[in-house]
Amino acid sequence: MARYLGSKCRLCRREATKLFLKGEKCYSDKCAMERRNYVPGQHGQRRRKVSDYGVHLREKQKVKRSYGLLEAQFRTLYKKAERMKGVTGENLLQLLERRLDNVVYRLGLAASRTEARQIISHKTLLVNGKMVNVPSYLCKPGDVVAVREKSRGQLRIKGALASAMQRGLPSWVEVDAEKLVGTFRSIPERSDLPAEFNENLIVELYSK
C-alpha cells in the first residue's frame, strides 16, 4: 500500500497547525512549528489568497493527515459516515476516533498514530483477548486493549504511556498503567474532539 515517506514536519507546516505526527518531538521546542511556522518551500513566507475550494481542501487534508490516512481510506470512512444516522461530519470524526490505531494512541500505548500502527502490525496487542493486527479495526465501547505479556517490557510503550499520563488521557478511555491494559469506554462526543477541526467543510467538499 502507498505511504507518505516525506518529512512529517512539513505536513504540519503545510496545514499551519500541529498534527502531532512525531510523538514527543511535537511537544518540545524542537517542533518545526515552533521554529518555522510558515508553509514549506521557496515561497512559503509569502501571503497567498486561498480560493474557497482551497479552504475546503486544506481542512480535509488536515484531518486526513492528523489521523494518518490515505485518500482512499479516508473516503471509505466518509461514505460509511454518510450512511449512518446523525450528522455526517460528527460521524466521520467519531469513526476516525474508533480506529484501533487511534485508540492505542489515545490510550498512551504509542507516542504517535504511526507508532501505534507499527505496534498493531507487529501483533503486539490483544483486543478483548484476541490478537488483532489491523490498524483500521473499529473499536466499540467496552473494548479492552491489552499489550501481550511477552511485549510488556518494551521501553517505547512504557515511555509513551508515562508521557501520556503526565499530559492526561481523554475522558473516553482509561488505562491500567501497571498491567498495560486500556479500555475504550465510550464514543467521544463532538465537544470532546479537537476544536480546530471543521468537519462541515469536509462534508461540503465531498458534496460538490
From Swiss-Prot:
For biological process, the GO terms are:
ribosomal small subunit biogenesis; translation
Outline the extent of the S4 RNA-binding domain: 98-158
Gene Ontology terms, MF aspect: rRNA binding; structural constituent of ribosome
Record-linked Gene3D superfamilies: Ribosomal Protein S4 Delta 41, Chain A, domain 1, RNA-binding S4 domain
Q: Which PROSITE patterns match?
A: RIBOSOMAL_S4 (PS00632), S4 (PS50889)
Q: Name one Pfam family in it.
A: S4
What SMART domains does the record tag this protein with? Ribosomal_S4 (SM01390), S4 (SM00363)
An annotated GO cellular component of this protein is:
small ribosomal subunit
Keywords (A to Z) from UniProt:
Ribonucleoprotein, Ribosomal protein, RNA-binding, rRNA-binding
Family, similarity comment: Belongs to the universal ribosomal protein uS4 family.
This protein's assembly is summarised as:
Part of the 30S ribosomal subunit. Contacts protein S5. The interaction surface between S4 and S5 is involved in control of translational fidelity.
State the protein's purpose. One of the primary rRNA binding proteins, it binds directly to 16S rRNA where it nucleates assembly of the body of the 30S subunit.
Protein name from the UniProt record: Small ribosomal subunit protein uS4
**Lineage summary:** Bacteria, Pseudomonadati, Pseudomonadota, Alphaproteobacteria, Magnetococcales
